[in-house]
């Protein structure tokens, strides 16, 4: 399997408990990326494709249906809702789920490029998610050079950059106080 650059970035702990929205064109590998994360975290049963009637029926019967499938590990499992944007009131549905159990689960939401309507999510999902766009394979990924460095904490980054030997003396003086 080809390692994707976005994997390490999107699933970094630095994003906290917020939902991860993975968008992109058809066949870019969104579902594969999600399933890879679930497998890595021992959460394979926590994948739900909202095109399936049984998933929708379970949701109608119990809004938090996925909690019945919770694996014994990890302590905070990942759950993936693929194509949830195809149901009516999907934003309200996600908000209710996240607000109810967002401290006990990590959510990843996948959908096609049309899913970028999340930019208009407004108040219902404000502050509850980060969006990541998965592009088709990049040459470096095909060549096996997908590793990227997750950006450090902004404060640490600035301190490191400003105290670097090639940094102008004036900026170094600012750091000293």
Which functions belong to the PLM regions below?
Residues 118-177:
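Interdomain motor-coupling "hinge/lid" segment immediately C-terminal to the ATP-binding subdomain
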């Amino acid at each position: 399997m080809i390692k994707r650059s976005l994997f390490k970035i999107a699933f970094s702990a630095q994003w906290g408990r917020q939902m991860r929205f993975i968008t992109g064109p058809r066949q870019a590998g969104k579902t594969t990326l999600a399933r890879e994360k679930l497998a890595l975290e021992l959460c394979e049963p926590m994948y739900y494709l909202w095109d399936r009637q049984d998933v929708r029926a379970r949701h109608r019967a119990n809004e938090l249906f996925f909690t019945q499938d919770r694996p014994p590990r990890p302590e905070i499992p990942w759950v993936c809702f693929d194509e949830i944007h195809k149901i009516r009131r999907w934003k309200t549905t996600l908000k209710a789920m996240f607000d109810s159990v967002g401290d006990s689960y990590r959510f990843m939401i996948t959908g096609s490029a049309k899913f970028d309507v999340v930019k208009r999510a407004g108040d219902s999902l404000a502050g509850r998610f980060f969006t990541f766009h998965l592009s088709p394979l990049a040459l470096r990924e095909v060549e096996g050079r997908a590793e990227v460095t997750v950006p450090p904490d902004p404060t640490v980054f600035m301190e490191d950059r400003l105290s670097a030997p090639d940094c102008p003396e004036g900026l170094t003086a600012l750091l000293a106080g």
